Each structure stands twice: as C-alpha cells, then as structure tokens.
Amino acid sequence: MFLYDNSLDEINKNMDGFHAGSNFAAAAAANPCRNLMAHPAPLAAPSAAAYTSSEAPAAGMAEPAVKQCSPCSAAVQSSSGAALPYGYFGSGYYPCRMTHHNAIKSCAQPASTFADKYMDTSVSGEEFTSRAKEFAFYQGYAAGPYQPVPGYLDVPVVPTIGGPGEPRHDSLLPMDSYQPWAITNGWNGQVYCPKEQSQPPHLWKSTLPDVVSHPSDANSYRRGRKKRVPYTKVQLKELEREYATNKFITKDKRRRISATTNLSERQVTIWFQNRRVKEKKVINKLKTTS
C-alpha cells in the first residue's frame, strides 16, 4: 500500500500506527521495509521521492525509476491473496494512483505484484487528474473496515490537486436499501438510485388529428370529435327541400343529394337523422305545453 505525505516524520508515524484489516497490511506495518511513494508533480516538488532518513539520496543525483530494498518475506506470503481494505490516515485524503515521473520504493520480491495489480504507473502526469480514482483514504477515523450508514450509499469524489474546476458531489445519496458494490467498479461511474416513483399523468399527444388521449386512462385512446363545420345556406336549403318530400332517405336519393350539395353520403345520412330527432323534440314540447 502506498502513501504520500510531505513530511518524513509523519510518514513514519503513520506507518508505525497503521492497523489494517488484511494480512498484507499487518505484515507491511510490522516489516521494516516501507512501501512509500512520493507525491506527483502537482502534489510535491519535482522528482521528490519518499525515503527513510538513512536512505535519502544526495542532492543533485539522478534518482532511479525504482529503488529496491531488502526482500519482504512476510509481504510476499500475504500479498497475492490479500484484499485492500479502506484505510484511514490522519494527514489527508488521497487516491492510490501515481504517475511514472517519481521514484517508487518497493520490495524486489513478488510483493510488487500487489502494487502492479492496484496501481497504474504507465500514465503521464497530465493524465493523472483525469484518471479514475479507484481507492480512497479517509482522514480522522480510527482503523478498521468502513461501516457506512444504513440506508445510504457513500460515493466519495476524490479531489485532485490541480483540478479546482472539478465539481464536488454530495457524498450521501439516499437509497431504499444499502447495496455494497465491488471496489473495482471505480468511483467515477454515475450512480443510479432506483426508487419507486408514482407515474405522472400521461401527457403524450398523438400526431393523429382524430386520436386524443383519454384523461381517465392513460393507455387507452378514443376517437375524438372533429371540428364541426356548419352547412352553408345552399346546402341547408337543398336538405330541407328533400326532407319535406320524404323524411327517410334512400340510397339513390342520398347519392344525388351528396353530389348536389358537395357533402359526403355520411353527412347527408346524419343530417336526416338529426333532423328527425329535432322534429320529434319540437312535437313533444308542443304536446307538453298544450
């Protein structure tokens, strides 16, 4: 596991007092071989690597890309199958990704496979601020596994130095039930919180002119009434003349009236039906008044 800090004294204090929840972290804390890594260019001075007090390089000397220390047998045994827990340190809240510009002090044994598994050192310094932050460390808490509040999903957004324009999001998103997810999913993915929501009323409008949505049932449709077009005086005169001749219209008569008045046969039929109903209402009204 890699830490960064500006002070060597704070690094030693953090590593001596670190109690992790996995076998690898416990072995790394007890072993004198420290896996330390310096800040990248935006976080510290250029080419500033973390060393113990006895191994600090002389000023002006070129620093190697990887500096090896004595073999760490305890870390070799537990690094292959150890899982990385949440760590809590008292001096910052940093991601576990570093660039290749600075030196890395690691063990020469296969314990470095643990760092290769969880670290990506092939990216440039410019890509550091845009890469996904897969691990985070919280400050001001005691050692132990992270216990989130039930009913909430904790999604911290790791701040990056040099990227002040990056928006910060709320760390607590309400959910119906807490669902832990794997740490390999990354922290940059958008989190969707499913919640039961009442369906809003259906406001979709059909492009068809004769189809409208029913207000009581959003999924059912009924044929709407077309706009009423009043008959002209010439049409009404012809219809009234034919009605006076015969209240019930025949097929041949309907076709002839349709051609004369420039109306459809359906319109002619409906007009005769309405005219008979109207006459019936007038007769019934006269009977009731008399």
Swiss-Prot record:
Q: Which residues form a coiled coil?
A: none
- Which residue numbers delimit the DNA-binding region? 224-283
InterPro entries (alphabetical): AP_axis_regulatory_Homeobox (IPR051003), HD (IPR001356), Homeobox_CS (IPR017970), Homeodomain-like_sf (IPR009057), HoxA13_N (IPR022067)
State the UniProt keywords alphabetically: Developmental protein, DNA-binding, Homeobox, Nucleus, Transcription, Transcription regulation
Any Pfam family the entry gives: Homeodomain
Please give the Gene3D superfamilies that the UniProt record associates with this protein.
Homeodomain-like
GO-annotated molecular function? DNA-binding transcription factor activity, RNA polymerase II-specific; RNA polymerase II cis-regulatory region sequence-specific DNA binding
Report the locations given in the UniProt record: Nucleus
One cellular component (GO) term of this entry:
nucleus
Would I find Transcription regulation among this entry's keywords? yes
Q: Which GO terms describe its biological process?
A: regulation of transcription by RNA polymerase II
On whether Repeat is a keyword of this UniProt record, the answer is no
Q: Which family does it belong to?
A: Belongs to the Abd-B homeobox family.
Q: What does this protein do?
A: Sequence-specific, AT-rich binding transcription factor which is part of a developmental regulatory system that provides cells with specific positional identities on the anterior-posterior axis.
Q: How does it assemble?
A: Binds DNA as a homodimer.
Its protein name is Homeobox protein Hox-A13
Q: Which species is this UniProt entry from?
A: Gallus gallus
